């Protein structure tokens, strides 16, 4: 029984070791042309022409696939570059936001220190104002009494 080898949609019958080696090397290299040393058991010319047309079709499909693959690779490279640029912008923006946050935290610390100083001082001043008001009211009452007393005399 002769072994069958399939390359894409092409079936070939190989009955010699030399033919088998030719087919295997053709499959590896992508070269499906027949050499002069091919045995004399070639298929009829009509079958050979059909096989050559199929090989040509497979080669066209391979070229089309290569073009599509390259187009897809270029598209992916462009998308990657675009995404990389957007990522760089986002990182720069994040760095600016972090810097603003640090500055705001620093201002918050300063505000807290100022408030820590001012609140007790405000309390002291309120107490002092209260004492002064009380003193003023006491003097005002004393002056009012003295005026009434002098008018009564």
Swiss-Prot record:
Entry coiled-coil feature ranges: 46-109
Q: Where is the signal peptide?
A: none
Matches recorded under Pfam families: DUF4715
- Tell me a GO biological process for this protein: female gonad development
Q: Does this UniProt record's set of keywords contain Coiled coil?
A: yes
Keyword Coiled coil among record annotations: yes
Please identify the protein, giving its name as recorded: Coiled-coil domain-containing protein 182
UniProt organism field = Homo sapiens (Human)
Gene symbol here is: CCDC182
């Amino acid at each position: 029984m002769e072994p069958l080898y399939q390359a894409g949609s092409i079936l070939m019958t190989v009955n010699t070791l030399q033919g088998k080696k030719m087919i295997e090397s053709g499959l590896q290299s992508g070269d499906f042309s027949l050499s002069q040393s091919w045995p004399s058991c070639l298929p009829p010319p009509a079958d050979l022409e059909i096989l050559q047309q199929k090989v040509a079709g497979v080669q066209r499909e391979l070229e089309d696939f290569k073009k599509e693959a390259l187009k897809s690779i270029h598209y992916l490279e462009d998308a990657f570059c675009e995404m990389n640029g957007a990522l760089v912008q986002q990182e720069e923006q994040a760095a600016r936001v972090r810097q603003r946050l640090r500055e705001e935290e620093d201002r918050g610390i300063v505000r807290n220190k100022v408030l820590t100083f001012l609140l007790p001082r405000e309390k002291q001043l309120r107490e002092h104002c209260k004492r002064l008001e009380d003193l003023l009211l006491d003097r005002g009452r004393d002056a009012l009494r003295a005026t009434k007393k002098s008018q009564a005399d």
